[in-house]
A protein has these predicted regions:
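Ribonuclease/tRNase effector modules and their secretory precursors
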Residues: 1-92
């Protein structure tokens, strides 16, 4: 199993958008990889949240993490992380 490394940009986006490194790792390890732009990959995973979001101070039941990453020969490099908050469960 390849190690997962987050770029500086990905780490900053995780802080700003409310994702943790553990959530990103779980998402990459458990999700179905899809092709993204420029030879990268993406996947999504929905987590129970049941909290107030730090980004807009609203309550949400779910948080979906979407890392964009490169599958290199010796590691997986996370380029950026998108985070979506919702009150509806999504089938991924």
């Amino acid at each position: 199993m390849k190690p997962i490394r987050c770029s500086d940009h990905a780490r900053l986006q995780m802080v700003l958008r409310g994702a943790t490194e553990d959530e990103v790792i779980v998402t990459i390890r458990s999700g179905k990889w899809e092709t993204a732009k420029m030879g990268k990959f993406r996947t999504k995973h929905q987590f129970n949240f049941d909290k107030i979001s730090l980004t807009n101070q609203k309550f949400y039941k779910y948080k979906t993490i979407e890392p964009i990453f490169a599958d290199e020969s010796n590691e997986i490099v996370v380029v950026t992380v998108k985070v979506y908050y919702s009150n509806e469960e999504v089938k991924l």
